[in-house]
């Protein structure tokens, strides 16, 4: 089955006893969250990075979420969709938590959230 289909599954630690920090997609919060993976079995809702998790599982509904820096103190420049302005904007991400309204390039943000006919010819082709 496609990896995207796994996004709806609950995260599964599996029976092994490793303590591997992984990400799973939480459809309720529309965010990728951490869990401890045992290292074997489990299921497909299991990603090595928040980026891979979001890029596989987030939906266009993320575009309507608030822009959240999160509680951590890293200064990572990412893109988010500002629904009030109707456009993708740069914001500073703290490096943990937050939600799915978080994109790794302006292009990625526009592909999810861009409004056709906003003068962006790429979207009209």
Swiss-Prot record:
Cited Pfam families: Kunitz_BPTI (PF00014)
- Disulfide bonds, which pairs? 7-57, 16-40, 32-53, 63-113, 72-96, 88-109
The alphabetized UniProt keywords are: Disulfide bond, Glycoprotein, Protease inhibitor, Repeat, Secreted, Serine protease inhibitor
Give every BPTI/Kunitz inhibitor domain span. 7-57, 63-113
Q: Where is this protein found?
A: Secreted
Q: Site Reactive bond for trypsin: give positions.
A: 73-74
Instruction: Indicate yes or no for the key word Disulfide bond.
Output: yes
Q: Name one GO molecular function term.
A: serine-type endopeptidase inhibitor activity
Q: Where is this site: Reactive bond for chymotrypsin and elastase?
A: 17-18
Q: Which residues are glycosylated?
A: 26
Would you tell me the Gene Ontology cellular component terms?
cell surface; extracellular region; plasma membrane
**What superkingdom does the record give?**
Eukaryota
Q: What is known about what this protein does?
A: This inhibitory fragment, released from native ITI after limited proteolysis with trypsin, contains two homologous domains. Whereas the second domain is a strong inhibitor of trypsin, the first domain interacts weakly with PMN-granulocytic elastase and not at all with pancreatic elastase.
- Share any extra remarks: The amino acid at position p2' (17) appears to determine the specificity of the inhibition of domain I. Inhibitors with methionine in this position interact weakly with chymotrypsin and elastase; those with leucine interact strongly.
Q: What is this protein called?
A: Inter-alpha-trypsin inhibitor
Please report the organism this UniProt entry assigns to the protein.
Equus caballus (Horse)
